[in-house]
Amino acid sequence: MFKFLITLEYDGSDFHGWIEQPKTSTIQGELNKAINRVTKNAVFKTIGASKTDTGVHAIDQKVLLDLGFNPKLDLFKKAINKALPETIKVRSIEEVKQDFNIRDVLYKEYSYTINDKEYNILSNRFELNWDFEEIDIDKLQNIFNLFIGEHEFKLFSGLNHKELDSNKITTIREIESIDVKRALDKVVITFKAKGFIRYQIRMIVQSALNCYLNKKISADEIKEKLQGKGNKPPFNAPAKGLKLNKIVFKS
């Protein structure tokens, strides 16, 4: 089998996440259908580096493709893009070594975008609309600083009791950085870590925004929950504001 690394971008609005599912439109499912059509039912396998959730977008998703033959990559890329929906596109395809490991990630970078200005119908699919006063960047940054570093994130995850009890998923994680900036009149919150748990970023974002508004959760309660104490906060920021920006592999 030949191995290829695909860089994929997509508008996740109309898809039920990354993972292929029967009778449901997903990013991996659409990619597999396109490859199957182009290769005329050749044997292949795809593995994504990040399992983005329903409604989440990406500009740098990485996909390992195992394929039984070595195609001309420029023609292969064009053919796959022609077979894909308009909201999913292959940016690049390159051959990689046989020992390449799609899980050998140095870090992943996600961003969450908030529009605290006038509603924009053209960008609405990619941002959270903020119905309050303009956001104070420094004040919001101070709240997000609580989440930086190594913490127990089980209460800021979408893991159910069975998953938590199995101990198969590590919930003590380190977030390297969270940066709150204003870009093109939007508030952009950028997260960097080796990996994230399901719903982790969206639960952090909504908790921080609620804390910013002095609603439902305080800074002290956030600190307690980051020690695994108490209950899960029952809020989750909308998926449409979240985007996978970058995946960097170890050398």
From Swiss-Prot:
Disulfide bonds: none annotated. Substrate binds at residue 110. It comes from Mesoplasma florum (strain ATCC 33453 / NBRC 100688 / NCTC 11704 / L1). One of its GO terms (molecular function) is tRNA pseudouridine(38-40) synthase activity. Homodimer. PANTHER family: PSEUDOURIDYLATE SYNTHASE (PTHR11142), TRNA PSEUDOURIDINE SYNTHASE-LIKE 1 (PTHR11142:SF0). Belongs to the tRNA pseudouridine synthase TruA family. It is an enzyme of class 5 (isomerase). Its EC number is 5.4.99.12. It catalyses: uridine(38/39/40) in tRNA = pseudouridine(38/39/40) in tRNA. The active site is at residue 53. The keyword Isomerase applies. Keywords: Isomerase, tRNA processing. InterPro entries: PsdUridine_synth_cat_dom_sf (IPR020103), PsdUridine_synth_TruA (IPR001406), PsdUridine_synth_TruA_a/b_dom (IPR020097), PsdUridine_synth_TruA_C (IPR020095), TruA/RsuA/RluB/E/F_N (IPR020094). GO terms for biological process: tRNA pseudouridine synthesis. Signal peptide: none annotated. This is tRNA pseudouridine synthase A. Pfam families: PseudoU_synth_1. Formation of pseudouridine at positions 38, 39 and 40 in the anticodon stem and loop of transfer RNAs.
